[in-house]
Each structure stands twice: as C-alpha cells, then as structure tokens.
Amino acid sequence: MPKMKTKTAAAKRVRLTATGKVMHAGSGMRHNLEHKSARKRRALKRDDVLQTAQAKKMKGLLG
C-alpha cells in the first residue's frame, strides 16, 4: 500500500510542535492594525494551539 500524501493546504496553515501540539496563526493581523492597541497586536501575533477535536482532524490530514 502506498504512503499517504500530506494535504498541502493543511500543511501551509498549521505546524506540529515537538510534543505533538498543533499550532496555528490566529486571525486579525491582516489589516486595520492602526485601530488596534499595541498590546492587542502583540497578543494576536502569537500562534495558538488548536482545540483537541480539530487537532485530531488536522493530524490526519498531515499524514
């Protein structure tokens, strides 16, 4: 049986940590940044951990 291919659309959006968590970039950092406080922009810059159910699906897509 051939190897499973990685879904490249999923690979572009998430990354796996060494401990197996699935990290993703949050929304809200594309435009209208001048109206957001510096504190808010710093908070939005960080990557977030996906919830358990979504992380399980994404790991399946990553192969």
UniProtKB/Swiss-Prot annotation:
InterPro entries listed in its UniProt record: Ribosomal_bL35 (IPR001706), Ribosomal_bL35-like (IPR021137), Ribosomal_bL35_CS (IPR018265), Ribosomal_bL35_sf (IPR037229)
Keyword Glycoprotein among UniProt keywords: no
UniProt cross-references to PROSITE patterns, sorted A to Z: RIBOSOMAL_L35 (PS00936)
A cellular-component GO term for this protein: ribonucleoprotein complex
GO molecular function terms attached to this record: structural constituent of ribosome
One GO BP annotation of this record: translation
Pfam families registered for this protein in UniProt: Ribosomal_L35p
Region (Disordered) location: 26-50
Keywords assigned: Ribonucleoprotein, Ribosomal protein
Family to which this protein belongs: Belongs to the bacterial ribosomal protein bL35 family.
Protein name per Swiss-Prot or TrEMBL: Large ribosomal subunit protein bL35
Lineage of the species this protein comes from: Bacteria, Bacillati, Actinomycetota, Actinomycetes, Bifidobacteriales
